[in-house]
């Protein structure tokens, strides 16, 4: 790592365990024609292991200007590595390839949830994603109804992905050690999307709205007719519904709004 010091404002905790790095790369199942995108290259520990598997190309997205010289020197001999010197949220992944991508990274804790939600909007070009994130966030990704871990993020991402909790990772495997345990998760897009890309943003806002004041009954947030048409108890709360319930409820919500427009036209 040379003289590099991880920066708190970027939420940087560099992964230094070779065993965990290898496990992440194994989960990516890299083939020679793969396009891999890494979010947050840091000093390149994970990047190097990815490049050893010889994918077609690796795009490393990094916002921290102070590590650019380190990355460029470390990977100067790799023709299949491209450093993208930008914030992930300013990068259009669709412009990187005409095919599918594999997405990975040891995500900064301060923006991990935002990145995870954003990942869903690339599901049409995503082959799979493997991330290191805070354990608390990982538990929410695989959260079940009627538990404290079941949140907006659980429902939204489980709608589009099959999510595996791969392993927990202790703080000592990072530099500097974070104050929390981390976890590796793998997200594989579902073969058939229950909500179209065109409606994804509306669905995100819909689920988020239902989880606001999560203890309130659904009848206080959504028309009773929609609930009845979806077969949902008006007295139920968002945390009690399955992912399939949310999908069905959203479908009825769209139909109801469409019918309402027709009636008013």
UniProtKB/Swiss-Prot annotation:
Keyword list (alphabetical) reads:
Cytoplasm, Methyltransferase, RNA-binding, rRNA processing, S-adenosyl-L-methionine, Transferase
Give the highest taxon in the source lineage.
Bacteria
Q: Which reaction does it catalyse?
A: adenosine(1518)/adenosine(1519) in 16S rRNA + 4 S-adenosyl-L-methionine = N(6)-dimethyladenosine(1518)/N(6)-dimethyladenosine(1519) in 16S rRNA + 4 S-adenosyl-L-homocysteine + 4 H(+)
- Where do the annotations place S-adenosyl-L-methionine binding? 13, 15, 40, 62, 87, 106
One term under GO cellular component: cytosol
- GO terms of molecular function: 16S rRNA (adenine(1518)-N(6)/adenine(1519)-N(6))-dimethyltransferase activity; RNA binding
Q: Where in the cell is it found?
A: Cytoplasm
Q: EC?
A: 2.1.1.182
Q: Which InterPro entries match?
A: KsgA/Erm (IPR001737), rRNA_Ade_diMease-like_C (IPR023165), rRNA_Ade_Mease_Trfase_CS (IPR020596), rRNA_Ade_methylase_Trfase_N (IPR020598), rRNA_adenine_dimethylase (IPR011530), SAM-dependent_MTases_sf (IPR029063)
| A Pfam family | RrnaAD
The record, for NCBIfam families, names:
ksgA (TIGR00755)
Q: What job does this protein perform? A: Specifically dimethylates two adjacent adenosines (A1518 and A1519) in the loop of a conserved hairpin near the 3'-end of 16S rRNA in the 30S particle. May play a critical role in biogenesis of 30S subunits.
Name the family the entry cites: Belongs to the class I-like SAM-binding methyltransferase superfamily. rRNA adenine N(6)-methyltransferase family. RsmA subfamily.
Protein name (record)? Ribosomal RNA small subunit methyltransferase A
Source organism (scientific name): Persephonella marina (strain DSM 14350 / EX-H1)
């Amino acid at each position: 790592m040379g003289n590099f010091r991880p920066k708190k404002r970027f939420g940087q905790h560099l992964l230094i365990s070779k065993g965990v790095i290898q496990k992440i790369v194994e989960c990516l199942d890299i083939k020679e024609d793969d396009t891999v995108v890494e979010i947050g290259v840091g000093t390149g520990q994970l990047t190097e292991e990815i490049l050893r598997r010889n994918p077609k190309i690796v795009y490393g997205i990094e916002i921290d200007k102070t590590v650019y010289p380190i990355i460029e020197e470390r990977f100067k001999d790799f023709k299949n590595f491209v450093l993208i010197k930008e914030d992930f949220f300013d990068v259009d992944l669709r412009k990187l390839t005409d095919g599918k991508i594999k997405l990975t990274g040891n995500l900064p804790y301060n923006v991990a949830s935002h990145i995870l939600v954003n990942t869903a909007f690339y599901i049409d070009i995503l082959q799979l994603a493997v991330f290191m994130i805070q354990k608390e966030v990982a538990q929410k990704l695989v959260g079940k109804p009627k538990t404290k871990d079941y949140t907006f993020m659980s429902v939204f991402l489980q709608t589009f992905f099959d999510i595996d909790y791969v392993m927990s990772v202790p703080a000592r495997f990072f530099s500097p050690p974070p104050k929390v345990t981390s976890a590796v998760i793998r997200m594989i897009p579902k073969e058939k999307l229950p909500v179209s890309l065109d409606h994804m943003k509306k669905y995100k806002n819909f689920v988020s709205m239902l989880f606001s004041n999560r203890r309130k009954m659904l009848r206080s947030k959504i028309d009773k007719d929609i609930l009845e048409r979806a077969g949902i108890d008006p007295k139920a709360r968002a945390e009690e519904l399955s992912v399939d319930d949310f999908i069905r409820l959203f479908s009825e919500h769209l139909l109801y709004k469409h019918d309402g427009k027709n009636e008013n036209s």
